[in-house]
Amino acid sequence: MARKMKTMDGNHAAAHASYAYTDVAAIYPITPSSPMAEATDEWATDGRTNIFGHTVQITEMQSAAGAVHGSLAAGALTTTYTASQGLLLMIPNLYKIAGEQLPGVFNVSARALASHALSIFGDHSDIYACRQTGCAMLCESSVQEVMDLTPVAHLASIKGKIPFINFFDGFRTSHEIQKIETWDYEDLKDMADMDAIDAFRKNALNPNHPCQRGSAQNPDIFFQVREACNPYYDALPAIVQEYMDKVNEKIGTDYKLFNYYGAPDAEHVIIAMGSVNDTIEETIDYLVAAGKKVGVVKVRLYRPFVASALVDAIPDTVKQISVLDRTKEPGSLGEPLYLDVVAALKGTKFDQTPIFTGRYGLGSKDTTPAQIVAVYENTTKKQFTIGIVDDVTNLSLELGAPLVTTPEGTVNCKFWGLGADGTVGANKNSIKIIGDNTDMYAQAYFDYDSKKSGGVTMSHLRFGHKPIKSTYLIHKANFVACHNPAYIRKYNMVQELVDGGTFLLNCPWNMEELEQHLPGQVKKFIADHKIKFYTIDGVKLGIETGMGPTRINTILQSAFFKLANIIPEERAIELMKAAAKATYGRKGEDVVKKNWAAIDAGAQNVVEIQVPESWKNGEDEGLEMTHATEGRADVVKFVNTVQAAVNAQEGNNLPVSAFTDYVDGTTPSGSAAYEKRGIAVNVPVWNPDNCIQCNFCSYV
């Protein structure tokens, strides 16, 4: 069955599929799940109908799970979208909803829980905290899988009479944009069991056939009633596989409760769930081509955990198993997935197979192919971590050289921007233009800190003629753009270019000024590696076109399309102008025309820099870092050992020992004085003639 290709992120994929089976959506915003709720709300307002021909009824309230419980009890198919602390607050309701056999679906973009510090980024801490509630749990590894398998959660919940937590990785999947195949609602309707839906509605609390729920039971019968649900959980895996088979039949996939990928005679297999599986698959392709016998088992149905299905998925030739968990449970014998695997394999043909356990990816820590290779090469550390340097408890695995495992022909682009300057938004438009108007696969991911605005943003774009499984950040790029000239001395960005790559710098400098402002190591790298170097004065063009000095995103997007040559320049300009009209049309014709002028200006004002031979003699001047030299000793130590590296985007290189004094999450006050970033376009000057003594300048 041919499906429409669209470019979207994981949140919108989940919302699209879940909307079809939803009568009521109880929503409340929490990062990174909010876009699911926002999309559902927007579609309902626009009058989109579900498979029953109705628009979804939206209710927004703090007690979203309480509203879900009540709505389900009243006979409405109900969905909510949440993550992290928001999901934790739902746990009491999850027990009740599962105990009352109500088929709700909780779509979760899995996120870290606040422990020593808050993290808005992704791991599996939140969903693991719900594994004992009685809810079934289904996991997806990619944006395409979110689209394909979210219907399975809804349909199996209805037929199996058990609520589902349908989850995928926060940010890495929820916010990653991919070109994917999408469901038509007629196909989703075709898979629905209308008899099961009617039975659910007839079982609702209704004055026409009253019953009592929420009673209290005494020791004489509580245990027996609790055990009476066992047949439903025993039957659920077969129901899930039944709907996976229906999906497979429609779209030609091979979804199972556990899917194996790799060498048929693999000797070392990783077991994992979530977005890391795509990185593992890409690494396996690289290793198997080199003769290695490795593979991965991808966990899809985490609850109920079906031991027999796991055993069937593992090749008989396996000599070692490594289980990867994206959480930390201090004091436990191991993390949850590891303990499940150990219990599942006990007494089977893999009873004597060594099972190693590793932690990875906490708080969206990047997981690269080199780290996966380290897991496959590890034969000594039964407990390990990857992605960090643990020089305190020495659990981390040593990494080899970085690997390039992306499919041949994949183009990698990286954009350094300033939070709220429009760079991220422009790149979202760019990837959709590429995805929707070419036959190429496209992927976009956006890396930024927790600041509301003004922080560093890094946009990672990939596109090519083969599917893209690279669920990790770009560190070797064909194209790098720096949208703020202050960054050139603060961050290592040019060094991430491949030989012959393209570097675009937004700056007002001519050749003489470039000689003065570019650090020696940047000049040397550009010259030594034959980098094609271009500049554009986005601020000047922004002022001239009426966009203003800070809204330079459209100008730089146009410059990117000119230099990248993915789409013919005239066609790219035409598509950008159409996107600008669609985005800003409601704000009036004047705003649209300013954007069109900016698009034309960006394409026409790119300046190619002829790199002089003398740049090969450039000396390494190091990065500009603010260090503390006086003041309180605790502040000086923190700024110099931690903050300076973090501000230079080098925090990933800090070892565990750098944080032994901050293990409880506390940091010394007064460190913001050393975080001046020098990013302003203009510097204010006090004018005594205009001063009204408001004292506002004392706050600036």
Range-by-range predicted roles:
Residues I120-G170, M194, F350-G361, D528-K530, ...:
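Conserved thiamine diphosphate
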Residues E282, G670-A672, N695-V700:
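Iron-sulfur cluster-binding cysteine motifs and their immediate structural context
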Residues S18, I321, V683-V700:
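Cysteine-centered iron-sulfur cluster-binding motifs in ferredoxin-type domains/subunits
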Residues G53, F164-N259:
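Conformationally flexible catalytic loops at phosphate/diphosphate-handling active centers
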Residues V24-Q57, K250, P264-D265, V269-R300, ...:
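Anionic-ligand anchoring segments at beta-strand to alpha-helix junctions in alpha/beta enzyme folds, i.e.
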Residues M1-A129, G134, P151, F171, Q241-V389, H460-R462, A477-F479, T502-N553, ...:
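Thiamine diphosphate
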